[in-house]
Amino acid sequence: MEAAAKEWGGLTGATLNVYTIGSGAPSTEISARYAAGNAPALIMGDIQDIVTCVKSGYARDLKDQSWAKNGGLTYGYNKDGNLYSFPLCIEGRGLLYNKTAIEKTLGRDWDPSETKSMDDLKKLFDELVKGGMETPVALNQEDWSLAAHYLTLVYEEQGEKLEDGEKYIRALADGSEKIEDNARFKSLFDTFDLLMQYNSNREDPLAADYASNAADLAEGDIAFWFNGNWGWAEISEYYEDGTELGIMPVPQNDADNHAQEWLAGSASKPIMVDIKNNDEKQQAAALDFLDWLANTKEGNQVLVEKCSLIPAFSNIKEQATNGLAKSVQQAANEGRLFPGIIDYPGDHWSTLGATMQKYLGGKIDRAELGKEIDAYWAKQKLEPWN
């Protein structure tokens, strides 16, 4: 994005400074910026960050922008007839796989469609181990991977529609549902237990190194890695041309609601235009940059070729450039994506990420995990789902 800002600046004569944050939720930095009165003209965060800013009256309505009709209204954040976010890309997550390594180890052809259930996955893991791949899968230890990407599958896979997941988290918040009683929770965490059993980092799971996981998948030392298409950024450093990679749904025994066929995925990294700390001239420049990304060949190439993103806009004809992105793009084109929940509290991934780390590290059992998740949601006050 820094390169994109520089390229756009060279064309327009304007200056767009890109500020990045380290680890942790964007909500902390965004809140600090507003408290200091120096929020930037463009804010990229998680969807809950945009929702919070909209509630505070900080975001500009973007429905008048030309890109709105080409995907903005479909993938952006809409509220009360207004559009408040620019969808930078579509992202999907699940089990990343190295088909080349799997087939080499098995000595036969393999297709992800044959591995749908947890039982199928267990059988495949055992076959890979027998073929010499001692630990076929890698799990990350980061809180965002565990809570924002795996745990959230439980909410998102309650049904096909956004409202199914939104209503479920509200049921958790009002106490009418307990997560440990939920069939999807049981199914996904049966699989998570299996992933832990065959985890390449199982000797010290909380010391797992993200870059090492990427290298291991790219080089065929492991067959699977729970992650998303963004993992290509690290994988590409070790990737050998001709290696077949892709993303498949997390196999599980509960097949209801297309759980064995659909990927978790939605618009990611939404961008809003601030109206509280930025004047009309700054807002106009911000809008021009977004228009450049969505509506010019150069901007499109930044998204697809330089950033390896999956564009959310129908007018962009550039195709995904790697196997991970192609898997997600195909699922999106076929309508096989579970929509992402909008109303997560800003501390969801950090708080429940710590809980998930305890579970991954063997410090708590499944019952204790469920109780901590229930206790977290019991503290949340969510507006009724309209």
Which positions does each model-derived feature cover?
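Conserved N-terminal structural module of periplasmic/extracytoplasmic solute-binding proteins
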Residues: 1-51, 58, 254, 354, ...
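Extracytoplasmic/periplasmic substrate-recognition and gating elements
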Residues: 6, 103, 108, 198, ...
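Short helix-initiation/N-cap motifs at beta->coil->alpha
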Residues: 20-29, 48, 116-121, 203-218
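Short helices/loops that flank or line small-molecule/ion binding pockets
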Residues: 27-39, 56, 101-102, 122-132, ...
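Hinge/lid segment of periplasmic solute-binding proteins
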Residues: 46-103, 122-124, 149, 247-248
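Extracytoplasmic/periplasmic solute-binding protein
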Residues: 84-88, 93, 120-177, 222
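Glycine-centered hinge/linker elements that transmit conformational signals in sensory
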Residues: 123-125, 166-206
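Conserved C-terminal helix/tail region of periplasmic/extracytoplasmic solute-binding proteins
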Residues: 132, 311-317, 330-386
